Amino acid sequence: MLNNKTQNKKIFLLKEVMWLLPVIVFATFIITLSAKTKVPFYPVPMTMQTFVIMAIGVAFGKRVGLLILLTYFLEGLFGLPVFAGTPEKGIGLSYILGPTCGYLMGYFITVYLSGNIKDEDKILTRITKLIIAIIPTYVLGFMWLGTIFGWNDTIIKLGVAPFVFAELFKITLLALLIPHIFKLKKYLKS
């Protein structure tokens, strides 16, 4: 016979899993939608994927954010067309090791760092933390592009520069939405 403490722990874990499963499924679906939805932008179309990755870190914290991103990554690795450009540009490992690999790897750091944002942070603190959070995605993306295509001005022109203002817009928008995200989170958890 289990003692009360052990039973309570098992009930808590079961409740946690029952809460996490739909969250993970929903969040990976939202990441996929954000990757597939192209916003017209010059010279390269942009997606809202970085916005969603940061929002997941903010909303669910580091641990759950990483778990969501790992699930999304594994879905893509096993051949589900969850990434931008899939299945047209390949699926699974062949897509992951393509031009976007560095960005995909950077998402893990970005979601983790976004999980550091607190409800009580002031707007400028939120913006600063989000800028710091997105930098690894672009650094790793830039490094990977340079490794596979060679180091030239084109990498900066196509792989980083076009997205700077778009990222600043997304970061500002998310920073303004953070209080609402935390309110919704508290409501859903109650």
Task: Identify the residue ranges that each predicted region occupies.
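Residue-level signature of transmembrane alpha-helical entry/exit and packing/kink sites
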Residues: 16-24, 49-53, 64-65, 95, ...
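Alpha-helical transmembrane segments in multi-pass membrane proteins
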Residues: 23-31, 53, 57, 68-76, ...
